[in-house]
Structure formats: C-alpha cells, structure tokens
Amino acid sequence: MSDKKTQDEIEISDSKKSSDKESVNEGDNSSASNHKFKKGNGKGSSKGNRTRKNKENNFKDELSGPAIEQEGILEISGKGFGFLREKSKEFRQTPDDIFVTPEIVRNFGLRDGLWVKAETQMGRRGPQLTKLLDINGRNPDEFKTMPWFEELKAINPDRRLQMETTQDRMTTRLIDMIAPIGRGQRGLIVAPPRSGKTTILQHLAEAVIQNHRNIKVMVLLVDERPEEVTELRRALPNAEIYASSNDMEVKMHCRIAQIAIERAKRLVESGEDVFMLMDSITRLARAFNNANSKGGPTGTGGLTVRALEMPRKLFAAARNTRDAGSLTIIATALVETNSAMDDRIFEELKGTGNMELVLDRSIAEQYIYPAVDIFRSGTRREELLLPPHQWEKISIIRRGLAGHRPIEAIERMLSIMEKFPSNAQMLLDIKPMY
C-alpha cells in the first residue's frame, strides 16, 4: 500500500461517518454551536458542556480489550485530534496509528513533536490513547509548566562543542580550528557534488556522541538515496534518524522534516541540548517548492514565491536560549549542480546562518580531505566560543595562510596539524605576536 493511499484512508476513516466526526472533532455544526455557547451564558452554555461530556463518555464506552503500553511522536491535525507515529514504522502514517482525542490534546496542552508514552485500548477506529504515562520523559502534570519555544529568548552561541576526537581524524580537528561550533549554532556546509559532505556529517555526529553524551543527536535526511539512509542508520545507532528516501512522495519529505524540527523544539523547551544534522536543506527547499507549486507564479530557477518560507523557518529554529536548552542545526547546501534553482536556494539561505564550512571541488579532485576552503569558512562571533589565547593563535594561523591558494592553504594546514597529537598541543607551540 502506498503512503498516499494510506494517508487518504486515514483521513477518510476519521471523517467519513457523521458519528465519528462528532466524536473526533465534535462536528462542524456542533463546534460552531458550542463556540456560541461559550460566548453566552445560561442554558446554552450548560447544554454545550453537557453535550461535550456525553461525547467524552462515548469514547470510554466504545473502548475494549486490555490496556497496552505504547509510545510514539505526537502529530496533531488541524482539527484538534492527533496520532502517535511510531519509530518502528519510520513515523509514516498508517491505519493502526494510536488515536489521541481532542479532549486529551486540550486538557494536557499537548503539542506537535512530543514523545508520548501512554496506555492504549482498542476503539472503533483502532488503538486509542486512554492514559498518559509520560511526555518527553516527564510526568504529564509537569509538562503543563513548560514554556513555548517561540517565547524563549535567543542569544548568541557561547558554549563550544568540541569536535576533536582522535589525532588522525582531521575532519573534526580542522572544524574546531577554522569554523568552531557552539550550542545553538546555525551552520551551513556548502558542498559541491562529491566533495565529502556525507563523511563530514558522519564524523560530526560521532564526535558529539563521543564528547557530549548529554546532547541529543538527530539526523534529518531529505530525499536521500536509500543506501545512504541505511548506511547512516548502521553507523549512528545512538542517533535519532528521520529520513525520507528519494523513492517517497514529495509530501513525505516535507512532513518528516516538520516532525523532526517539532521534536527538537519540544526537547529544547524541556531544557535539553539538541544537535541536528540536516542533509540537505537544498533538497528540502525543492520538496516544498514542488508541494506548493500548484500553478502559482515562479521566479528565478523555477522557485515559487513562497517556496523558501518553510525551509527558512525550519532552519531558523536553531538557537541558543537563555532559560532553556539549545538547538544546533548543521545543514548542507548543494552548489555547483548546474541547477539555477539550487543556486537560488543557496543565495537565499546563506545569510540566515552564523557559521559556514565551504567545501571545494578542486581540492577534492586532488584527493585532499577534508576539502575545505579555509578562507571562505568561519564562524560569526567565534570569540565567544574560544578562550582568548586560543582565538589569538588561530588568528595568527589564518594570517600566516593568507596569500596562498585554497589548495595550498589546506595542504599546509593539514601538514602542520599532523605533527601534533592534538589541537591544544599545536596551539601551545605557536608563539604569540607581541
């Protein structure tokens, strides 16, 4: 059964019967009536409350079978009810997803992207949530006090994420020197084809898992080759993988990205630090462009007027917060693909990040990795992430490389780094310029 057919069947099963529609969404007509009763007083209001209570009781009466503990990510529809999407099914929409009533969503203030563990029983539509056990690992009552992500105060990244792991892994050592990453960074890896971006992403994820065990690592793969998805799942068993391969529909690409970002937001609200890798924001923008085209006006490269609105919003979710956690997003942007659309996407998004790691195809063609253009790579406000003495010595290195061609600069940088067991030891050996 295709994803599209499954999704349509779910929507039909939730709305085709009038009795079902009244139970799930209280009916279009009764919703309007209840809205009027809320505004008024007297008998109308009590009648509306009585009707709602009767419908809530109907849910309980129709349940049968033993209570079973299940869990998944909550996805709320525009009509107020929701479903738990299961990790084992790659968060796809299926007919046996756990149904969450509008009353439970309202009473507990549930939001998209929450990881919910609950007791369920069989209802006439399938499994239905009957009792919340925990929300994002917390007691359901504690969750009610959580702030909203949009209300959190965003500040500059000021806590560095150390990426260096071993002496011979030059990828992460070079990033620590040239484009350091902090908690809440919004970074772009600007990558031509076959320049080593997938390897860099994998090394970054492994570094965070090894060096920062308290940080939740998430990987979002959009319109990716199926074998790449399988390889990353195998290589990163401790990361949460959200993937849509290129044999899936466009709507699935958009949907899985929104689920992943909402999941990350809910973790930040709970005070956790999240590190997300996104591959790629270019393909995500293409997906939203195709999903929302519908014959509307197009601009340069075939992009519709509002095609980049949602990708920009998702990428902009990366931030360091003052009173809660942080969301770091490192996304890849594809360039030199002979596509006017890809070039336009990069031009529109490059100003939204605060860190860039630029890969160079001419360096990669010489089999020099990581194929980084040192002069075009860097982090804004890196002085907030580095101790003053390290920042000064890294500035000395950059000045020493100035005037070289990019391929000469990376060769010289790597040859120096190979002589020392760590970056710290290398920086100690550099004499300050007084």
Language-model segments: which ranges?
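Charged, low-complexity terminal tails
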Residues: 1-67, 73-75, 80-81, 88-96, ...
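Short, structured beta-strand/loop micro-motifs enriched in basic residues and often containing a Trp
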Residues: 93-102, 165-171
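Short, charged beta-turn/beta-strand-edge "cap" motif at the junction between a beta-strand
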Residues: 104, 120-125, 194
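Short nucleic-acid-contacting surface segments enriched for D/E, G, S/T with interspersed K/R
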Residues: 104-117
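P-loop NTP-binding catalytic core
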Residues: 122-189
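P-loop NTPase catalytic core
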Residues: 187, 195-196, 204-208, 212-434
